[in-house]
Structure formats: structure tokens, C-alpha cells
Amino acid sequence: MPHVKYRKEHIVTSVVAVIVDDDNRVLLTRRSVPPFHGQWVMPGGKIDLGEPILKALHREVMEEVGLEVEVEGLVDVFEHITPDESMDHFVILYYRCRPLSCAVTHNPSEVAEARWVAQEELADYEMPDGTRFILGKIFPQRRRHDDR
């Protein structure tokens, strides 16, 4: 296997909140910054060195959408290596969360917009493969429908 030169000498570890409300809608945010600029993802970001994982999760959710959440558990771990010249390597931990309030206040420096989206509308949103994979775990009936 040929050796690939990555931009950073370490793996970037990130945490993402899959926030599902009592109406079974998921909170999606349209990114205003790379990576995934312009695509719909769930709130999250990099874990700072020395920062506990769940503290990072709460911090990122508050920074991006102004919500407090209750963490329900780990959904999955996903690996992403950027296909472009940046050659970044990410390991992303996805946690299912329940919002303590649904009043979203998005941070325009990171998020162009935020929306509560019903599972039957998810196919209409442009999102990275990792996001679709995780949403298929949260809403397995959607994944079966998308496979047809």
C-alpha cells in the first residue's frame, strides 16, 4: 500500500450530537465553514486536548445551536478521511441526545441555518455519507426505504 502524506500528524477526534426531540425530529445544521461547507450535518466539533468527551459534546451543541441536551448514549463511531488535498483524518463519536428545549439559536459563524427535520424529509437534504449512515441507525425504517 502506498504511503499517504496527511496534513496533520494526528487523528482529529470529534463529537457529534444526534438531537432527537419528542416528535421524533432530528436537528440538522447547514455548515457555513469547512469541512462539509453548505451540507446538512448535526451539531458537533473537535474535542480539545484534555477535554472530557461529554463536556466537549455539551460545549459544541451550546456553541452551534444554543441548546442544552441530555445525553442518551453512544450511537456509533465513524471514521472519515477527506478525499481532497487536505488529507485530514477524523474519528467522530456520535451520541444520541434529547433537547431540554427546542428553541434553537444558531451561531452564524459556524452554522448557516438550523432546522428540526422529520425523518420522512431527510432524503431531501444534502449531507455527508457519515451523517446518512448515522441517521440510518437512528431511524432504521428510513434506511430500509432509502435502499429501494
Model-inferred region functions:
Residues H106-K137:
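NUDIX/MutT-family hydrolases
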Residues E79-A103, I138:
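Active-site-adjacent beta-strand/loop module that shapes the phosphate/pyrophosphate-binding cleft
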Residues R25-V26, V104:
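Hydrophobic "anchor" residues
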Residues P35-Q39:
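A conserved beta-turn-beta hairpin within the catalytic core of GNAT-like acetyltransferases
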Residues R132-R148:
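Charged phosphate-binding loop/patch that engages nucleotide di/tri-phosphates or the phosphate backbone
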Residues M42-L74:
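The catalytic Nudix box helix
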